[in-house]
Regions:
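Conserved beta-sheet core of the metallophosphoesterase superfamily
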Residues: 99, 106-178
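Short acidic/glycine-rich loop or secondary-structure boundary segments that cap or lie
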Residues: 40-43, 76-79, 101, 110-112, ...
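Core catalytic region of metal-dependent phosphoesterases/phosphodiesterases
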Residues: 2-95
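Histidine (H) residue identity feature
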Residues: 10, 40, 62, 104-106, ...
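Non-catalytic terminal accessory segments
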Residues: 183-184
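Functionally constrained cores in energy, signaling, and assembly domains
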Residues: 9, 20, 37, 55-56, ...
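Alpha-helical architecture
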Residues: 6, 70-72, 102, 124, ...
Length: 184
């Protein structure tokens, strides 16, 4: 199974347009949205080509493939615009015998680990900083932000395919800063 992960689009049609190109190239079986879909929040500058309504339309195209969790900037108003559920604080996906705990990161994250078994991949966004590391028997995975990357990072997303987890450049799909790991 191939899964494409992204987070923190914050209503940027520019970022979602680039993501659409990556989805077409990657051809994922499942798309995981790790929160903060439409609103930029009071702490972030407006992202490139901010348009929450158009962003919702762009995301709804993939409504049958998306599993999403609620970010700290997501609200019931956002849910009214999106045609797939976004209001859960977490979800779990099993792929190729691997458990993924999906959350935005403002509640559960590498510093506040949920009660999960060793070997689980904790996938979250929120920080806008891509991460792929092992900690206390878990894999901590953050695909970064497609719209408002922080700490001098570029826009990124993530891919799970054939037992391999990676962070990739939104611009061209290349492996980002050697963030790739075999998970067996």
């Amino acid at each position: 199974m191939k899964i494409l992960f992204f987070s923190d689009s914050h209503g940027s049609t520019e970022a979602l347009g680039n993501l659409t190109l990556r989805i077409a190239a990657e051809k994922p079986d499942l798309i995981v949205m790790l929160g903060d879909a439409l609103y930029h929040g009071p702490r972030n500058a407006l992202p490139g080509k901010y348009d929450a309504k158009k962003s919702a339309e762009m995301l709804n195209i993939y409504k049958k493939k998306i599993i999403a969790v609620r970010g700290n900037c997501d609200s019931e108003v956002d849910q009214m615009m999106l045609e797939y559920p976004i209001m859960s604080d977490y979800s779990t996906v099993w792929a190729d015998g691997q458990r993924f705990f999906l959350t935005h990161g403002h509640i559960w994250n590498g510093g506040n680990v949920p009660p999960v078994t060793a070997g689980t991949i904790l996938a979250h966004g929120h920080t806008h900083i891509p991460t792929l590391e092992e900690k206390d028997g878990l894999v901590i995975f953050n695909p970064g932000s497609i719209a408002i990357p922080k700490q001098e990072n570029l826009p990124t997303y993530g891919v799970w395919a054939d037992g391999e987890l990676s962070v990739r450049s939104l611009a061209d799909g290349s492996i980002y800063r050697e963030m790739i790991r075999n998970i067996q």
